């Protein structure tokens, strides 16, 4: 059990085992706050900085899945599939710091009335509480973008400011895609990533 735990810490970059020397702790990695290679819910990241997170400009809609989204979520293609789109701006105190669009199949809600759900809560909490689905891992793609004009306005960006766009497919414990997320981050966040040479 201890050997497995050490192996996991080594995979995550916290430890390095060196033959003839022993096990070394990489203190720089231990002190990293927002690791892009570890999925952290953005409310937690904002609280860790000492700010209070909240969502506003919240929009929840039902939309028919495009062929691309149906493929990403591995939905049946023999009939139109309805998706739930949750769009929101997230604030840190009074500063707009990101805009997210979360997309879930309506079927995950098992005929539950959407009107009774507080969609201002973190999407992973909503998936766990109302869909009985735990997200365990994501596949993410990163892009530096200028972003759509409407989102730039909501985030109060200066003309020269870029956004970090994170596109994710989120998987359940059964390795099934259950959620697509597209998030535009401002430079409020300082992300780090631990990369190992292969």
PLM regions with names:
Residues 1-25:
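N-terminal helix-turn-helix
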Residues 27-198:
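All-alpha effector-binding/dimerization core of bacterial HTH-type transcriptional repressors
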